[in-house]
Amino acid sequence: NEQIEKICKAFDCPVVIDEAYAEFAPDTCLSLLDICPNLYVTRTLSKAFGLAGARIGFLITSKANMEAIRGNHVPYSVNSLSMKAAEIVLAHATEFKPEIERIIKERDAFLSKSYASFSFSNSKANFLLIQTPHIDKLLALFSQKGLSVRSYQQKNYCRVTIGTTQENQWIQEVLDAFEQEETNAMQ
């Protein structure tokens, strides 16, 4: 937050912070809105609330900024079904908290483990970035297990979404098998 505050104060222009994964992270910059009049925070209902298909999010900023934006708002930019879904989800937002907490707990369980053949980024989202020089082997194991992951082969990493407890067990099985294969290959 200190860096964001410095940026806001150093530049006389809008500063937009994307907090798409805010529900999974311990920090938010919302507390800066009172002292940084040029700060705009965007959020989405796609990640923690499961409305990716609805393509809906929202903006948090000062009242003065909102009034200025309203004059430039495109009418009907969000369809009525997405709007209704957003209203329902936001009215029941607290009901999502246990699931969000489960995802955080299971994500942190992955991150707490140490492996010789790969590493995790320090994720504050609902996914893990896994890096290994043998990414092709790891991707093949995920594929054999029927798990779909996002590949960034050129950079030797992949992205795995924290799913249900069962899906996370399958991910763990793949990671354990990969670790075992890599350990055996080194001997």
Regions of interest found by a model, annotated:
Residues 38-113, 118-121:
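PLP-dependent aminotransferase class I/II
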Residues 2, 141-145, 150, 154-187:
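PLP-dependent enzyme catalytic core of the Aspartate aminotransferase-like
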Residues 12, 61-65, 91-92, 132-135, ...:
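Short loop segments at secondary-structure junctions
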Residues 53, 124, 154-156:
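Short acidic/glycine-enriched loop/turn segments that link adjacent beta-strands
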Residues 1-48, 65:
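Active-site pre-lysine segment of PLP-dependent enzymes
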Residues 104, 108, 112-145, 158, ...:
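Conserved PLP-binding catalytic core of the aspartate aminotransferase-like
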Residues 2-6, 31, 105, 109, ...:
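Alpha-helical scaffolding segments of alpha/beta enzyme cores, especially the outer helices
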